């Protein structure tokens, strides 16, 4: 019989026979744990629940299985803890606002009936990853995938209403159900990785144009406390051009998950017109939950993302915040007595981060569909210090840095993305898309960067000698810098017209700002800049972002006329 011989917080040492990464039940309360190390007949067990009250000598029960998640209908519009247990079902069963220790509930609802429509017929040969049929889940076509380890001839296939436990087909004598299980630490197989080809449109202008990533790409959002990481992550979750959104609250405040739960059902998806919650999966592993489960929640989100990617959908996984997960790794590592690396983090921090971020990508699935998994990870460096290990190791793995700046946040510049230090490595991939549809945008974007850089340099001079010391040829950069910052880069998350900026609106806004800039440059030397400013055209451009699409188009025409009149006045 396996017995506990030592307890150190979430780390339990037991004597007996175990397999590495096996899920075990610890103590009389049968707490969920995972074997993370074996030494002779001793096993080091990471316990995913509170170990208060656990005693030395209590039994440890083997399950013989790794940590797995059930994948099938019922995942969407649901909220799970870090181990994939549905929080709503836990509350209905226990009437407790806390998760009781040792509770064992399946991820998917066993009673709900789904209408299964077969896409294959009796006698067809199928293999792992093939789509055998579909189920309608809140208007979403949930494609039922053959488990990757199954192949052969379909002996029987049924149509009709089934619970997820009932057999829908028989292949080589094996029953196929609406769901299958998959180990969360094991990436799901695919045929090949494909090149990026299409930008990941978020509805946030500064991300879509200045620092875009491709569908299947990855980005890090580091920033100090109060700089707007969570609001930006929620904005991406709300409006991203993605079929499925998985939002992982990893070690963050419970109120943030509550906000998402309250807001998303009220908001409509711009593509389908249905509540946003219908395409969203929430994984809540808040700061007061056991820290060991933070690691599980990150892999859980990636596995669910890969499952929908394998159905040919585009998926985005939002992890807020990976720093809390790294802190959990640091705590477990120190309890194991491992030699610490920089700032006390384990030496394998980079490998662990890579295991997560490398699961992103655009792939050809086993059933020859194209799917993508985009990963966006928030990082919370203490004091906003980007040189700390989690931020530095993350930047080695991701395709873009969206750096949040508390100075911009205090100036009420939202999203507070520092446009001088942020970057994207994926511009070359998405550039082709813009070249085909909006060729002029590439040049305008470069000009915007040049103006903002020059404005920043001149602001240092202005802070010492004042703006009057500058010539009009220099003042134009301050004038245009303000228009770009306030009229284009800034975005109001709480304004119904400005919260989500369709790409068409973003491009038109860029063009009108650029048109105004070219006109003012032509007039410099003929009219003083002060006189041009008095016309007030720039104020109208700045306010454009608050207009609805219909008003926006009308206002653009009026501003174009004013710019033309200004040019013809000379």
Swiss-Prot record:
Q: What class of enzyme is it?
A: translocase
Which chemical reaction does it catalyze?
A: ATP + H2O + 4 H(+)(in) = ADP + phosphate + 5 H(+)(out)
The EC designation for this entry is: 7.1.2.2
User: Which keywords label this protein?
Assistant: ATP synthesis, ATP-binding, Cell membrane, Hydrogen ion transport, Ion transport, Membrane, Nucleotide-binding, Translocase, Transport
Protein name, please? A-type ATP synthase subunit A
Q: Where ATP is bound, by residue?
A: 223-230
A GO BP entry: proton motive force-driven plasma membrane ATP synthesis
Bilayer-crossing regions = none
* GO molecular function terms attached to this record: ATP binding; proton-transporting ATP synthase activity, rotational mechanism; proton-transporting ATPase activity, rotational mechanism
Please give the organism.
Nanoarchaeum equitans (strain Kin4-M)
Q: How does it sit in the membrane?
A: Peripheral membrane protein
Q: Show the Pfam families listed in the entry.
A: ATP-synt_ab, ATP-synt_ab_N, ATP-synt_ab_Xtn, ATP-synt_VA_C
Which InterPro entries is this protein grouped with?
ATP-synt_VA_C, ATP-synth_a_Xtn, ATP_synth_asu-like_sf, ATPase_F1/V1/A1_a/bsu_N, ATPase_F1/V1/A1_a/bsu_N_sf, ATPase_F1/V1/A1_a/bsu_nucl-bd, ATPase_F1/V1_b/a_C, P-loop_NTPase
Tell me which PANTHER family the record gives: H(+)-TRANSPORTING TWO-SECTOR ATPASE, V-TYPE PROTON ATPASE CATALYTIC SUBUNIT A
Q: How does it assemble?
A: Has multiple subunits with at least A(3), B(3), C, D, E, F, H, I and proteolipid K(x).
Q: Which domain of life is it from?
A: Archaea
* GO CC annotation: plasma membrane
Task: Determine if Membrane is one of this entry's keywords.
Answer: yes
* Originating gene: atpA
Location in or out of the cell: Cell membrane
NCBIfam families the record matches? PRK04192.1 (NF003220)
UniProt family annotation: Belongs to the ATPase alpha/beta chains family.
Where it mainly occurs, coarsely classed, is membrane
Q: What does this protein do?
A: Component of the A-type ATP synthase that produces ATP from ADP in the presence of a proton gradient across the membrane. The A chain is the catalytic subunit.
């Amino acid at each position: 019989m396996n017995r506990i011989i030592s307890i150190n917080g979430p780390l339990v040492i037991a004597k007996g026979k175990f397999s590495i990464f096996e899920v075990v039940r610890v103590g009389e309360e049968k707490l969920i744990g995972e074997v993370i190390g074996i030494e002779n007949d001793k096993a080091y067990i990471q316990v995913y629940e509170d170990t208060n009250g656990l005693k030395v000598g209590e039994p440890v029960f083997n399950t013989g299985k790794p940590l797995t998640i059930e994948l099938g209908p019922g995942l969407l519009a649901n909220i799970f803890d870090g181990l994939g247990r549905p929080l709503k079902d836990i509350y209905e069963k226990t009437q407790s606002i806390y998760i009781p220790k040792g509770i064992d509930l399946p991820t998917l609802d066993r009673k709900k009936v789904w209408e299964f429509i077969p896409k294959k017929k009796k006698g067809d040969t199928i293999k792992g990853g093939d789509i055998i049929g579909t189920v309608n889940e809140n208007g979403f076509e949930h494609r039922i995938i053959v488990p990757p380890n199954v192949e052969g001839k379909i002996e029987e296939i049924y149509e009709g209403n089934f619970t997820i436990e009932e057999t829908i087909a028989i292949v080589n004598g094996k029953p196929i159900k609406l769901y299958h299980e998959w180990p969360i630490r094991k990436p799901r197989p695919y045929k090949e990785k494909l090149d990026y080809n299409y930008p990941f449109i978020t509805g946030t202008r500064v991300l879509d144009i200045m620092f875009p990533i491709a569908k299947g790409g990855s980005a890090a959002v580091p920033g100090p406390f109060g700089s707007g990481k969570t609001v930006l992550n929620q904005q991406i979750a709300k409006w991203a051009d993605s079929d499925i959104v998985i939002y992982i609250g990893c070690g963050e405040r419970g109120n943030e998950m509550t906000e998402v739960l309250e807001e998303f059902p009220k908001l409509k998806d711009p593509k389908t017109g249905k509540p946003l919650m219908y395409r969203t999966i929430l994984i809540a592993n808040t700061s007061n939950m056991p820290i060991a489960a933070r690691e599980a929640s990150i892999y859980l989100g990636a596995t669910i993302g890969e499952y929908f990617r394998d159905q040919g959908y585009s998926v985005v996984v939002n992890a807020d915040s990976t720093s809390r997960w790294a802190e959990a790794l640091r705590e477990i590592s120190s309890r194991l007595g491992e030699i610490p690396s920089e700032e006390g983090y384990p030496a394998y921090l980079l490998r662990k981060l890579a295991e997560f971020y490398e699961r992103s990508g655009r792939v050809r699935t086993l059933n020859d569909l194209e799917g993508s998994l985009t990963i966006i990870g928030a990082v919370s460096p203490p004091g906003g210090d980007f040189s700390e290990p989690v931020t530095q190791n993350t930047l080695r793995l991701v395709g873009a840095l969206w750096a949040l700046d508390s100075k911009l946040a205090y100036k009420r510049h939202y999203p507070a993305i520092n446009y001088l230090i942020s970057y994207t490595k994926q511009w070359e991939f998405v550039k082709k898309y813009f070249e085909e549809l909006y060729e002029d945008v590439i040049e305008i974007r470069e000009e915007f960067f040049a103006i903002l850089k020059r404005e920043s340099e001149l602001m240092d001079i202005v802070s010492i000698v004042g703006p009057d010391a500058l010539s009009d040829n220099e003042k134009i950069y301050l004038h245009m810098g303000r228009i770009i910052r306030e009229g284009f880069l800034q975005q109001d998350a709480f304004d119904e017209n400005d919260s989500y900026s369709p790409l068409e609106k973003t491009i038109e806004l860029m063009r009108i700002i650029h048109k105004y800039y070219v006109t003012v440059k032509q007039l410099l030397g003929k009219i003083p800049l002060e006189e041009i400013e008095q016309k007030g055209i720039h104020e109208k451009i700045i306010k454009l972002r608050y207009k609805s699409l219909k008003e926006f188009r009308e206002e653009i025409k009026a501003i174009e006329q004013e710019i033309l009149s200004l040019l013809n006045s000379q």
